[in-house]
């Protein structure tokens, strides 16, 4: 049976977002939501017919909120809003981000507080399920009043305007609708505002980054465990009784992950008089990785709330009361997504330091730059440079976006979140850190193959090593390889969900204890 996810505004999970955004799983509006949507719409229709003054329904927008709009102009008002607010810049957002945006907006609207017609929500749903993906520029949102510019670009194809991708081809909005067999719509009162006023874009990008960060945290533990195998790491820093007296959840989880991954390894060792303890990047794995785990667990808890929230303005209450408030403001997610970027940056930063330990012959006791006949061959020399470059870039990107604000709209919107910038930065940091962790795994596998003794790996590290070596070659010397290709293969391996799934079939990995 084909899987279909019901959207009721209450129960969407981050895993559902991934299934719909990346795996093309279909979704539908849950029957339980229909009554609330229709009731909310009736209230808006009554507002227009009674000529009541309500922001965004019978008034202008932003600082023009005191300009009254006649009932006969309320429809034109909404189309004008979309045409003028679609003012984004930059490259288009990737397909998975666009699909996540459409999904989260639908899920918010079906809660029945936005006054939008059911048929209009169903039109956006039809675009999503039929694979019509609006062209949404990545830049241009202040994260308050919501993600106005990018969401306006999302709406354009619904009106037969703008641009959209269909089956990989960029078309005009109308062409995309025609090829998909979808009719365009006209907006009714308040509907333009209901579609574009909210934190949907920053939440969608941040949700994808958060999910990927959780996978990266597990991969970083694996990378660290492989480095421990290379360096004959001392295992006492991972003993449970050390961590139970400082019961930070992420720290406990990391120590357990390392123990599970290294179970049965013949490469690890115990402290001796000549070697009392390992350096921080190995010994303090639970404390460093664990801190990022705790941060990202917090961010996920915020994402879980936001993807099931109403972030529109004004809000149409069940009793007919209309509230002009600030649920569109991105600050509740801007700060967590800045936190997310910092947490991921630390993972890339410490992984790069372990790459340096692997390629440094004085620290690894292996050939310089992990290649036979160093000098004639350079091996992993510049690979470490590249990782250092990415780690340094991450440190710049990790500067919080949410500490900035530039007033807008004639100072009516005088304090904004910059939350969309925070989410986009976090995703860029994630991509950089993932490349670094992939390189650490590649370098550790190379180092293991260069070790003079060939001892049994741990229960989890052996599974990872065997899978990795099926795709990424040992580098004998420089002459017959292009290391760039091998680095790309390494990244492709760890980005394939089946790699981590196979390791987790062998050993349990988690981010919280």
UniProtKB/Swiss-Prot annotation:
Q: How is it modified after translation?
A: Contains an active site 4-methylidene-imidazol-5-one (MIO), which is formed autocatalytically by cyclization and dehydration of residues Ala-Ser-Gly.
- What GO MF annotations does this protein's record show? histidine ammonia-lyase activity
* Catalytic activity line of the entry: L-histidine = trans-urocanate + NH4(+)
User: Which Pfam families would you find in this protein's record?
Assistant: Lyase_aromatic
Q: Which GO terms describe its cellular component?
A: cytoplasm
Main subcellular localisation = cytoplasm
Cite the annotated pathway.
Amino-acid degradation; L-histidine degradation into L-glutamate; N-formimidoyl-L-glutamate from L-histidine: step 1/3
Lyase listed as a keyword? yes
Q: Which NCBIfam families match?
A: hutH, PRK09367.1
Quote the HAMAP family the UniProt record gives.
His_ammonia_lyase
Q: What is this protein called?
A: Histidine ammonia-lyase
């Amino acid at each position: 049976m084909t899987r279909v996810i019901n959207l009721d505004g209450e129960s969407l999970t981050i895993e559902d977002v991934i299934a719909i955004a990346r795996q093309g799983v279909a979704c539908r509006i849950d029957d339980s939501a229909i009554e609330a949507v229709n009731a909310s719409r009736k209230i808006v229709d009554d507002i227009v017919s009674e000529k009541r003054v309500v922001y965004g329904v019978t008034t202008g927008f932003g600082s023009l909120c005191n300009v009254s709009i006649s009932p006969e102009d309320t429809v034109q008002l909404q189309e004008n809003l979309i045409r003028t607010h679609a003012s984004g810049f930059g490259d288009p957002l990737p397909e998975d981000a666009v699909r996540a945006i459409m999904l989260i907006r639908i899920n918010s609207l079906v809660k029945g507080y936005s006054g939008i017609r059911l048929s209009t929500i169903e039109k956006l749903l039809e675009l999503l399920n039929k694979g019509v993906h609006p062209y949404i520029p990545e830049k241009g949102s202040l994260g308050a009043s919501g993600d106005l510019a990018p969401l306006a670009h999302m709406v354009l194809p619904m009106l037969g305007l703008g641009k959209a991708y269909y089956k990989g081809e960029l078309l005009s909005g109308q062409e995309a609708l025609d090829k998909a067999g979808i009719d365009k719509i006209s907006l009714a009162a308040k509907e333009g505002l209901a579609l574009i006023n909210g934190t949907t874009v920053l939440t969608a990008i941040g949700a994808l980054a958060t999910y990927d960060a959780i996978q990266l945290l597990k991969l970083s533990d694996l990378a660290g465990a492989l480095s421990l195998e290379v360096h004959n790491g001392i295992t006492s820093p991972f003993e449970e009784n050390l961590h139970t007296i400082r019961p930070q959840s992420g720290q406990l989880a990391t120590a357990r992950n390392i123990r599970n991954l290294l179970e049965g390894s013949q490469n690890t060792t115990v402290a001796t008089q000549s070697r009392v303890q390992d350096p921080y990047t190995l010994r303090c794995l639970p404390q460093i990785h664990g801190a990022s785990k705790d941060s990202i667990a917090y961010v996920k808890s915020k994402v879980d709330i936001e993807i099931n929230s109403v972030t529109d303005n004004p809000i149409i209450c069940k009793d007919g009361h209309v509230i002009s408030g600030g649920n569109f403001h991105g600050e509740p997610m801007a700060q967590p997504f800045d936190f997310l970027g910092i947490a991921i940056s630390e993972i890339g930063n410490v992984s790069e330091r372990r790459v340096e330990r692997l390629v440094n012959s004085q620290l690894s006791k292996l050939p310089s730059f992990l290649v036979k006949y160093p000098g004639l061959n350079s091996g992993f020399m510049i690979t470490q440079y590249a990782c250092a470059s990415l780690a340094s870039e991450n440190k710049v990107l990790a500067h919080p976006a949410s500490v900035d604000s530039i007033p807008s709209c004639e100072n009516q919107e005088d304090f904004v979140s910059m939350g969309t910038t925070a989410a986009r930065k976090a995703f860029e940091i994630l991509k950089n850190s993932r490349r670094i962790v992939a390189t650490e795994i590649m370098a550790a596998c190379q180092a293991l193959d260069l070790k003079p003794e060939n001892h049994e790996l741990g229960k989890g590290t052996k599974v990872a090593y065997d899978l990795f070596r099926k795709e990424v070659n040992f580098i004998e010397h420089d002459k017959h390889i292009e290391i760039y290709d091998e680095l790309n293969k390494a990244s492709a391996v760890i980005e394939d969900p089946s790699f981590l799934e196979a390791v987790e079939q062998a050993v349990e990995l988690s981010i919280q204890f």
